[in-house]
């Protein structure tokens, strides 16, 4: 018979993790975390379960999580099924009336309710809504220009029903959070003209984070964070450093608008924004509750 009474090393590790997390839990109790969950991060059911468990845990330790989700790939798939061609300008989907209807159907009727269901299965209570509900997010039309290659003249491009938040009424989210539930927001908004507008999910999350005075804005995506020229993760950045990395070409492509959202958020009063890989198990908890963190944290320095 074994006389070894030493604790299980795995249990010790778990206990040490909790001890390390405690000061962070105390620090963030009562604060708001806005979490943007990208459409590209939704493909793995196991990762979806991990995400839902993380959100429920945040709520359980006294943090108020607010989920804003994307759904670009899913919208594109539905449009293809319906025989509707997708066209993009500066990464924004050109949205005519038919595309706007499809986007609202996919985002509000499918993805939003799926995330609410994940959270319920993880033991939480979530309420799905869009920016249209209670006129929570009023959008204004996004305007873009493109240089004509023949005339070399900048010309206006009509993106259709693509909007950006002009005004946010936080009362709907506050009411849900104070009731002990978790708001899950689809990036659809109402315009002053009464039309429905499709809003970039990163932009929506950043605007909501500013309106709520969030402690953290998390952008969960399918990359580890911001990488340097050697493809190594950059753990901390300030707006000034981001400008320098853009100028020398280190930051390119789709990472630029994400960082613009982060900079806008921290300049608007959000304590910090983080870009991290939503496919990594419990990456958000690692970022929030450990010294090392995960992903790239953007702050004012």
From Swiss-Prot:
Keywords: Amino-acid biosynthesis, Arginine biosynthesis, ATP-binding, Cytoplasm, Kinase, Nucleotide-binding, Transferase
Origin species: Rhizorhabdus wittichii (strain DSM 6014 / CCUG 31198 / JCM 15750 / NBRC 105917 / EY 4224 / RW1)
Enzyme class: transferase
Protein name per UniProt: Acetylglutamate kinase
Principal location: cytoplasm
Gene Ontology CC entries for this record: cytoplasm
Role noted for this protein: Catalyzes the ATP-dependent phosphorylation of N-acetyl-L-glutamate.
Superkingdom assignment: Bacteria
Molecular function GO terms recorded: acetylglutamate kinase activity; ATP binding
Binding locations of substrate: 71-72, 93, 198
HAMAP family membership: ArgB (MF_00082)
Compartment list: Cytoplasm
Family of the protein in this entry: Belongs to the acetylglutamate kinase family. ArgB subfamily.
């Amino acid at each position: 018979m074994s006389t070894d009474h030493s604790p299980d090393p795995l249990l010790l590790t778990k206990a040490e993790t909790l001890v390390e997390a405690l000061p962070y839990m105390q620090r963030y109790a009562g604060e708001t975390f806005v979490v943007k969950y990208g459409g590209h991060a939704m493909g793995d059911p196991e990762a979806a379960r991990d995400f839902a468990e993380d959100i429920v845990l945040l709520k359980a330790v006294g943090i108020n999580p607010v989920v804003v989700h994307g759904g670009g790939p899913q919208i594109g798939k539905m449009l293809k099924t319906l025989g509707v061609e997708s066209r993009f300008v500066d990464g924004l989907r050109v949205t005519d009336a038919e595309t706007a209807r499809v986007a609202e159907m996919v985002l509000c009727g499918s993805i939003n309710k799926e995330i609410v269901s994940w959270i319920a299965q993880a033991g939480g209570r979530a309420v799905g809504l869009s920016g249209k509900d209670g006129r929570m997010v009023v959008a204004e039309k996004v305007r873009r220009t493109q240089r004509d290659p023949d005339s070399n003249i900048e010309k206006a491009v009509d993106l259709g029903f693509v909007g950006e938040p002009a005004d946010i009424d936080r009362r709907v989210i506050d009411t849900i959070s104070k009731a002990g539930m978790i708001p899950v927001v689809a990036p659809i908004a109402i315009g002053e003209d009464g039309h429905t507008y499709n809003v970039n999910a990163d932009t929506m999350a950043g605007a909501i984070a500013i309106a709520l005075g969030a402690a953290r804005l998390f952008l969960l995506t399918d990359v580890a964070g911001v990488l340097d020229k050697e493809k190594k993760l950059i753990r901390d950045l300030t707006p000034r450093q981001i400008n320098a990395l853009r100028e020398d070409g280190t930051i390119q492509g789709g990472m630029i608008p994400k960082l613009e959202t982060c900079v806008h958020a921290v300049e608007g009063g959000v304590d910090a924004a983080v870009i991290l890989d939503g496919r990594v198990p419990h990456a958000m908890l690692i970022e929030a509750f450990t010294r090392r963190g995960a992903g790239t944290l953007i702050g004012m320095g």
